[in-house]
Amino acid sequence: MASASPVATMSGRGARNLLQFLRLVGQLKRVPRTGWVYRNVQKPESVSDHMYRMAVMALVTKDEHLNKDRCVRLALVHDMAECIVGDIAPADNVPREEKHRREEEAMKQLTQLLPEDLQKELYELWEEYETQSSAEAKFVKQLDQCEMILQASEYEDLENKPGRLQDFYDSTAGKFSHPEIVQLVSELEAERNANIAGAASEPCS
């Protein structure tokens, strides 16, 4: 019987760098999603919360034409730079080119802490998402928007204020094309519209 391949080990410096990388990525658990902060949502989700559910959404896709593993990886990496630059929202009025420049620098800084093969893998995943250069990147971009309006709906439910976060829905109008996501969004909007209509029909106290 052939013996198992030995597990690769790292140098002390490599371990220290990996620990620093993990601590930086851990900051994502403490970076709130800026859009919710600006709308005075109580206890807003973190960037990490958002990316986790996106990764789960990618994991459960039924589209066999997509590389599911790559979709999950893209979801986990796409906002990783925000552990350094923060969540730059449209309301911040930072030009797209400047936002990209900051995030590109952050990704280079972050991935330099990893072995060369992982540096390349993570940076290229981020770049693929940024440039929307694959079917998987386009799908994950739509997951990003879908997860956002799902979260908006949940905040409206938690606050018992149906329709309060309509601007998040407006910002995604016409942006969904993948059949699976279109169906999911349609169901979400039907439920939300029913909640709004129900609230409107309730007598004022």
Curated annotation (Swiss-Prot):
Modified residues (N-acetylalanine): 2
Annotated binding of a divalent metal cation 1, by residue: 50, 78-79, 144
Main EC class the enzyme belongs to: hydrolase
Residues recorded as bearing Phosphoserine in the entry: 3, 5, 205
Domain of life the protein comes from: Eukaryota
Residue sites binding a divalent metal cation 2 per the record: 82, 87-88
Catalytic activity, as annotated: a 2'-deoxyribonucleoside 5'-phosphate + H2O = a 2'-deoxyribonucleoside + phosphate
Family: Belongs to the HDDC2 family.
Entry protein name: 5'-deoxynucleotidase HDDC2
